[in-house]
Amino acid sequence: GVSEDTIRRDLRELAAERLLLRVHGGALPASPAVADFHAREQVGSAAKTRLAQAAIRLIMPNQVVFLDGGTTNAQLVRQMPRDLAVTVVTHSPSIAVELVDHPLIEVELIGGRLFKHSIVAVGAACIETISGIRADLFFMGATGVHAEAGVTTGDREEAAIKRAIAGQSAETVILATSEKLGAASPYLIMPIEEVGTIIVESGVPDDRVKPLAARGVTLIEA
């Protein structure tokens, strides 16, 4: 057998290489979604497009929709039909700019300090503005989606912003590409039970999605 000390040392080395996230009693796969924004845009773009198309079917005319930043939500706005009439609230300048040519979409851009990795605003001013808005839907980005570890991301301030928006939204929806399922990042956004719907790629192994469904989350395959 392998000694506990050897296992602990191996876990420490893997954690140092960011291949896993150590948790109480063991370890989880570390989310690979840590590259810079433009590098992440090139990863799995076909899958992100399918998830985005499924997400758009959840949006009803005249709703108020919070849109998080990130590369999957960038695909979501690119797939939005030109005749869709909604109000989009976002703390992502890049998401706002994508919607400039949509004549029926009202865009509310929330400001703050720019977190360059995700191209989103963060900070106290951002949270204060969010507290005055109520939304029907929040399409939230995350780097890890795990039944026990919850919904996680790689930055503490970004996690706080996402949590604040979810608290002001009737339903939170996550578009989760396969590499995010079963993975975890250092900062908890919320327990998985607080998410309404997760849109996943069709054909994802059952062991990745069944634990999520068991916690009451609605799963949509795309």
Regions found by a protein language model. Give the residues of each.
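HTH-adjacent hinge/linker in prokaryotic transcriptional regulators
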Residues: G1-F66, G70-T71, V77-A85, V89, ...
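Conserved phosphate- and dinucleotide-binding cores of soluble alpha/beta proteins
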Residues: G1-V2, A16, S94-A222
